[in-house]
Amino acid sequence: MRLARSRFRQWLLSPELLVIASLAFGVTLRAEEKPSIVATVIRAAKLFDPTSGRVLDSPVVLISGNHIEAVGSRDLVTPANARMIDLGGATLLPGFIDVHTHLTFDAGGGGYESLGISIPRAALTGAKNARLTLLAGFTSVRNVGAEGYADVALRDAIDAGDVIGPRMQVSGPPLGITGGHCDSNLLPPQFHYSAEGAADGVEAVMHKVREVVKYGADVIKFCASGGVFSKGDNPRLEQYSPAEMQALITESHRLGRKVATHAHSTVAIKDAVRAGVDSIEHGIFLDDEGIQLMKEHNTFLVPTSYPLFWFEEHAPQMHLPPWVRRKRPSLFPPPSRT
């Protein structure tokens, strides 16, 4: 199966060349930044070209405004008045793409602590994480889930040049069944609270798709199965019915949006693929039949492998709720770094 990243390039704007080493010197290229000079020339020891698999010695990169005009060797003709940046022995790399992020979340948070986080606070967390993500080498990301459309606001702030960060494709609130992984299940019934993306039934999910598109979603995210951090559900069980998935995905595609689904359950993965989902997120219990279906439907897997290592390292210091501690070992066994 092809890697997810190759196809998701069509979901995102083409990334600018990210000069990794230049960040240490305080040189940051950000999306849609208004240029103050006509041209910039960057020199370094090497440049990696992933298209050809070659490493170019003594590269010269010519940047005009926000666009890379040319990449060549020392004999590349450059404007006489261009700003010169010589990075010495550094190696230049293209910007990376992360297709599963939650920039407005605090990685160490969860459980009842999340109830105290306001939407403005989440947006500010997103501004912090967006900058760190760019400095880590990622020039484009797909953000698949944020309350209150905080990710939409963050995307727009980055595009306007008000916040430093990568280009973003965002989903807004993820869709899910009442009481499911994408709902908010921590408050007692007298509060009558449900997450923004909660929707049940064919007509309701179609309406919810239209709503999140109305408020700025570039991509649609829904939860096809239970998860780890959600209270009262089972990651091995399907949540949306096949009919609901079909309606949700069909309506999303009709409105020109790709669809990603959180799916651990073997059955949920297969039903989502048959319904035409574009990507499976996580896919913990994906089996051989599911893999074959994904190949037949040209569906991509986003395995999100890194959290396996992150949780193994940080779980002892986190105040994980009891239901997370019960679920985690079956979904996140101690990972092998081989």
Question: Model-derived features: where do they sit?
Answer:
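N-terminal secretory signal peptides that target proteins for export/translocation
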Residues: M1-W11
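Bacterial N-terminal signal peptides
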Residues: S14-G26
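Histidine-rich, glycine-flanked metal-binding segment
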Residues: E33-V38, L47, S52-L93
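Metal-associated gating/positioning segment near the N- to mid-region
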Residues: A90-D162, T178-H181, N185-P188, A243, ...
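Active-site mouth loops of central-metabolism enzymes
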Residues: Y112-L124, P188-H207, K258
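Short, acidic/polar
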Residues: A122-A130, G201-E211, H264-A268
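Divalent metal-dependent hydrolysis catalytic cores, especially in the metallo-beta-lactamase
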Residues: T125-D151, G165-P174, A217-S230, K258, ...
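Active-site core of metal-dependent hydrolases
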Residues: T178, C223-S336
